[in-house]
């Protein structure tokens, strides 16, 4: 009887390729899976398999995304690649594929182009924490000075958007040659894989973050008090701990006196679990859906924020007409809608369906939020846009 192969539990990291159209993002994705599958096992994916990306829906928005996976020496990676520029914009704004780090692909033959800049800006706005650069098509450049020049431009561009341009790793390679099996260039892909292992730190797991539970429902149980239910977004809650109720109304402190899951009593509720939390001395009408239960002091309510937003086009079920400043839709955060008004950048008169845009939002009541929180924009219950908080304005 053959023995099962021993599986070491590996750190799981989410990455993706970003960069200008035709600079080689998909070719590099194929090359990574091909080169690494030879060394560490796993499945090689051909260019066509990745390029014909299936449609997915995230927050009601159709996005074409290819997901591949591969192993490196120390880790397991899930990697996203998008065929079109619009798909990147939607993907990054909706957080459909959250990235722990991105591989920026820049063709050495072109240098940084408009979408290179736009993707770096988006990565900054939506909180992609780390960028590694793959300078592609270096087999087509004989002039070493030209390579140095392109590298300098890329570093300047990264620094412009608050990434560490001076210290960001840049690998000079050729995705196509590596995909064709050329050893010199395959070694560059292996170099990229070890840089991913060393440069992108292990992400903080949601269980290690402070406790947060978006409230979905509120009940009162006679003789026991008020119970709020929801899915624990992060951290751990234990019986007897002090918690805060944040958002919509003034922040209130209370104590958790009991935790239930599937009608069983628990000592604690953990990230990912659906639980009911019994609150001491809290009245039924003091809590509502849309607030959050959190570890005291770890999240504050805010009404004003800067955001990066994608507006659905009409084929996606969005608006058929543009909107202008003073537009008042609902902003759906976690479990609830809050009305807000928008401020557009000075040079923008109107926003068309299918656009992505920076806007400042003023909500009529405050919501517990931090930078990086995702939201949907809705009109009468229908999603017309998706956004991410890029900066809270206190």
UniProtKB/Swiss-Prot annotation:
Name of the featured protein: Elongation factor Tu
Matches recorded under PROSITE patterns: G_TR_1, G_TR_2
A Pfam family reported for this protein in Swiss-Prot or TrEMBL: GTP_EFTU
Oligomer and partners: Monomer.
Protein purpose: GTP hydrolase that promotes the GTP-dependent binding of aminoacyl-tRNA to the A-site of ribosomes during protein biosynthesis.
Keywords on record: Cytoplasm, Elongation factor, GTP-binding, Hydrolase, Magnesium, Metal-binding, Nucleotide-binding, Protein biosynthesis
The encoding gene: tuf
Catalytic reaction annotation: GTP + H2O = GDP + phosphate + H(+)
Key word Secreted present: no
Protein location: Cytoplasm
Residue ranges of the region described as G1: 19-26
Gene Ontology CC annotations of this record: cytosol
Sequence ranges assigned to domain tr-type G in this UniProt record: 10-204
Disulfide bond sites: none
UniProt-annotated stretches for the region G4: 136-139
Stretches the record annotates as G3: 81-84
Record-linked Gene3D superfamilies: P-loop containing nucleotide triphosphate hydrolases, Translation factors
Residues holding Mg(2+): 26
InterPro entries assigned to the protein according to its UniProt record, in alphabetical order: EF-Tu_GTP-bd, EF-Tu_GTPase, EFTu-like_2, EFTU_2, G_TR_CS, P-loop_NTPase, Small_GTP-bd, T_Tr_GTP-bd_dom
Principal subcellular localisation of the protein: cytoplasm
UniProt record similarity statement: Belongs to the TRAFAC class translation factor GTPase superfamily. Classic translation factor GTPase family. EF-Tu/EF-1A subfamily.
């Amino acid at each position: 009887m053959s023995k099962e192969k021993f599986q070491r539990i590996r750190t799981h990291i989410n990455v993706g390729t970003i960069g200008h159209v035709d600079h080689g993002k998909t070719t590099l994705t194929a090359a990574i899976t091909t080169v690494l599958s030879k060394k560490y096992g796993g499945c090689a994916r051909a260019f066509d398999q990745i390029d014909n990306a299936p449609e997915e829906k995230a927050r009601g928005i159709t996005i074409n995304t290819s997901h591949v996976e591969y192993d490196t020496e120390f880790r397991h990676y899930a990697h996203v690649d998008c065929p079109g520029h619009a798909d990147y914009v939607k993907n990054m704004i909706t957080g459909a594929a959250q990235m722990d780090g991105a591989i920026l692909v820049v063709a050495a033959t072109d240098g940084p182009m408009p979408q290179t800049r736009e993707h770096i800006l988006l990565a900054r706005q939506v909180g992609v924490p780390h960028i590694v650069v793959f300078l592609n098509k270096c087999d087509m450049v004989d002039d070493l000075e030209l390579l140095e020049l392109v590298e300098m431009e890329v570093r300047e561009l990264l620094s412009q958007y608050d990434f560490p341009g001076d210290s960001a790793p840049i690998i000079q390679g050729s995705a196509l040659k590596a995909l064709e099996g050329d050893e010199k260039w395959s070694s560059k892909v292996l170099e990229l894989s070890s840089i991913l292992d060393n440069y992108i730190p292990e992400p903080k797991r949601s269980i290690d973050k402070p406790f947060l539970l978006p409230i979905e429902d509120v009940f009162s149980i006679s003789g026991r008090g008020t119970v709020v239910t929801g899915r624990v977004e992060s951290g751990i809650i234990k019986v007897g701990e002090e918690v805060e109720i944040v958002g919509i109304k003034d922040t209130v402190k209370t104590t958790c006196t009991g935790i239930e899951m599937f009608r069983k009593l628990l000592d604690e509720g953990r990230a990912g679990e659906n639980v009911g939390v019994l609150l001491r001395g809290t009245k039924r009408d003091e809590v509502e859906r849309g607030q959050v239960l959190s570890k005291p002091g770890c999240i504050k309510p805010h009404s004003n924020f800067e955001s990066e937003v994608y507006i659905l086009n009409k084929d996606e079920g969005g608006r058929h007409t543009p909107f202008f400043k003073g537009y008042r839709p609902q902003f759906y955060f976690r479990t609830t809608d809050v009305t807000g008004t928008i401020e557009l950048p000075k040079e923008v008169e109107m926003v068309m369906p299918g656009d992505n845009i920076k806007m400042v939002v003023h909500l009529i009541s405050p919501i517990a939020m931090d930078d990086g929180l995702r939201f949907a924009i809705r009109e009468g219950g229908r999603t017309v846009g998706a956004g991410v908080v890029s900066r809270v304005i206190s």
